[in-house]
C-alpha cells in the first residue's frame, strides 16, 4: 500500500442548529466502528453540553466557553467564535497529533458548531479548512433537516447556504438529507434535477399561503434563484440518511470516496497553481526590492554609467532640471537603514563593505 493510499479523508460536518448534525456524527461513528474502521474525531463545538460519542480531541478540554463569555463580556455567538479563534491559535499542535494518527485511520471526522455562519464565515473556520485540505483529502458534509426543507423557501435557503460554502471553502461538498426515516427526501432530489417539478411545488406553496401579494413576490424570487442555481446542482452529490436507523450510511461513504477523487483531480492542481503564483509573486517582489536598493545606491545591475542629456533630466511639467534620484522618497538615513536590513536578512557581517554587499546582491539577482 502506497503513502497516497494511506492518507485518511477529513470530513468536516456542518449544518444548521437542529438539523441532526451531532446525531449524524454519532451514527457515522458507530457505523465505521461496526466495519472495524474507527475514525479519529475532533469536536469543535465549545458550547455543546453532552456528546453522544467519544471525541479524540475536544475543544472543551482546552477552552471554557462560559469563562470566555464572562471574561470578554460576550453573548453566546460571540463566545463560540472567540473560543474557536483561541483554539485555532494552537491548531498546529492539533495537526501534529493528527499526522501521528493518520496512518492508522481511514477517516477524520470534524464536528462543528451548530451556528453554521460562525464556522463557515470566520477566519478560524477558513484556517481549519485550509490547513486540513493542505494535508489530506478533505470534503464538507452539509447536513440538511429534511422535514423542514419540505417548504420551498426553506429548501432554497439551504441550497444558497450550500452554494456559499462551496464558493468560500472551494472544497468538495456532499449534501446529506437527514431524518429520512421521518420524511422521504425524494422530493428534494426531484427539485434539484427537475426545474418544472420545483415550479409546481412553489405554485402549490403559494396556493396554501395566506400572505397574498408577498407570497407571489417570494414565489417569483425563489423561482428565479432556482433557475440560476440549476447548473450549480449538477456539481453536488446528495444522499439520504437517517441518524436514528443508520439508513444511507453506506451511500454516504461511497459519496465520500467520489469526493476524494474529486479532491485529487481538481482541488490539488488548483492548490499547486496558487502556490506557484505566490512563489512567483514573492520572487518578483524580491527582485524589485534588490533593484530599488541598487538604484538608491546609484549602482546599476551591470555597474555601467549611463549619461543623461538635458532633455532627459528636464522636468516635463515646469521645464526645470531635476535629479533622477531626487524624488525617490529616500534620504541617506533611509538608505543606511535599508542596507542594515539586507545585512541582517542575508546574515552578512559589518566587516564586508557596501560595495561587496552590492556585488553579492547582484549575483543573487542573476541566479
From Swiss-Prot:
State where GTP binds.
15-23, 178-181
Cite the Pfam families for this sequence: ATP_bind_1 (PF03029)
Entry's Gene3D superfamilies? P-loop containing nucleotide triphosphate hydrolases
Positions of region (Disordered): 306-332
Statement: the UniProt record of this protein carries the keyword Signal:
no
CDD domains assigned: GPN1
Which intervals carry biased composition (Acidic residues)? 312-332
Q: Identify the enzyme class.
A: hydrolase
E.C. number, please? 3.6.5.-
Q: Which GO terms describe its molecular function?
A: ATP hydrolysis activity; GTP binding; GTPase activity
Q: Where in the cell is it found?
A: Cytoplasm
Known function = Small GTPase required for proper nuclear import of RNA polymerase II (RNAPII). May act at an RNAP assembly step prior to nuclear import.
**Binding partners and assembly:** Heterodimers with gpn2 or fet5/gpn3. Binds to RNA polymerase II (RNAPII).
Q: What is this protein called?
A: GPN-loop GTPase 1
Origin organism is Schizosaccharomyces pombe (strain 972 / ATCC 24843) (Fission yeast)
